[in-house]
Design a protein with these regions (language model features):
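Conserved beta-strand positions in repeat-built beta-propeller and related beta-rich domains
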Residues: 28-32, 68-83, 123-128, 163-168, ...
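Beta-rich, blade/repeat-based domains predominating
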Residues: 10-22, 52-63, 69-74, 105-118, ...
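A short loop-to-beta-strand structural motif that recurs across blades of beta-propeller domains
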Residues: 35-37, 87-90, 130-132, 170-172, ...
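Beta-propeller domains
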Residues: 30-43
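A short beta-strand motif characteristic of beta-propeller blades
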Residues: 3-11, 44-49, 98-104, 139-145, ...
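Fold-core signature of tandem repeat domains
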Residues: 19, 26, 36, 66, ...
C-alpha cells in the first residue's frame, strides 16, 4: 500500500464533483450549479458554461463529446424546469455545448463516475456495485465486474482503471480486463473526500465537492503524489 500526499490547487468552484483532463485543460462539473468549468493547470478559470445536468457528478470526454453523469434529484440547488429527477448519462457536443442525447444508466440506478476508454464508456453502478463498460452508441453492455466499493470517480491508466470510494475512503486500481485489484490508496483521516478522479501524465487528480455530509468544510481540487 502506497503512502499518499494530496497537493491542492486554488479553485473558486463551490462543489467540484467530477473532473476530466482533456487537451491540457481540466473540465470540472460543479454539483452546485451544474455548470462545467474549464481550468488551466494552476486552477485559473478559462471558461464556464451551463448544462441541462441535474446533480452533476462524473464527467468524461470522448469522440468529440462531453459525457455527464446526471445523478437524479438535486439537493444542492433549487429545482429547474429542465430537471427530471432521474439518473441519466448526458451526451453534449464539444463545440456547440448543446445536449445531443441522454441515456438511462445501465443498472437503472444512480451514477457517479464516467470514463472514456478507446471508443467505449465505463460507468459506475450500484445495483450491484460494479464497473460497467458500454458501447456509447447504444449503451449495450460490453463487460462488467462487481467491486467491493461504493464507486465514485474513475480514471484509466494503461490496462488499469482507478475508482474512488467516499464511504471507505480509498482509491483502488483494477485490471480492467478481469477486475483484479492491482493497487490501493488509503486516504488519511485529514485527507479529502474523493469524489472525482482523472489522470494526466501518469499523475492522478481528484476533486472534493464537500457535499453532501462533507469530511471537511471546503471544496478542493488537486493532484495525488504517491510515494
Amino acid at each position: 500500500m502506497k503512502k499518499v500526499e494530496f497537493l491542492p490547487i486554488k479553485t473558486e468552484i463551490e462543489m467540484p464533483n467530477g473532473l476530466q483532463w482533456h487537451d491540457k485543460k481540466l473540465y470540472v462539473i460543479d454539483q452546485k450549479t451544474d455548470n462545467i468549468f474549464i481550468l488551466n493547470e494552476k486552477g485559473k478559470k478559462l471558461d464556464e458554461f451551463s448544462t441541462l445536468c441535474e446533480n452533476g457528478s462524473g464527467i468524461t470526454i470522448g469522440d468529440n463529446f462531453i459525457w455527464l453523469a446526471s445523478n437524479g434529484e438535486t439537493e444542492a440547488r433549487p429545482f429547474r424546469g429542465s430537471d427530471t429527477h432521474i439518473s441519466w448519462i448526458l451526451k453534449l457536443d464539444m463545440n456547440s455545448r448543446n445536449l445531443i442525447s441522454r441515456f438511462p444508466t445501465p443498472d437503472g440506478g444512480g451514477v457517479h463516475g464516467l470514463e472514456w476508454d478507446n471508443g467505449l464508456l465505463w460507468v459506475t453502478a450500484f445495483n450491484p456495485t460494479a464497473l460497467i463498460l458500454v458501447n456509447p452508441d447504444n449503451f449495450e453492455v460490453q463487460f462488467k465486474f462487481e467491486i467491493d466499493q461504493s464507486p465514485h470517480g474513475l480514471a484509466i491508466e494503461g490496462e488499469g482503471i482507478w475508482c474512488s470510494d467516499r464511504v471507505d475512503r480509498n482509491i483502488i486500481k483494477y485490471n480492467k480486463s478481469n477486475g483484479k485489484i492491482l493497487e490501493k490508496i488509503e486516504i488519511p483521516d485529514d485527507g479529502p473526500d474523493p469524489h472525482g478522479l482523472s489522470i494526466k501524465d501518469k499523475i492522478l487528480w481528484y476533486s472534493d465537492a464537500a457535499f453532501p455530509n462533507p469530511m471537511r468544510p471546503f471544496p478542493e481540487i488537486g493532484s495525488i503524489e504517491l510515494r
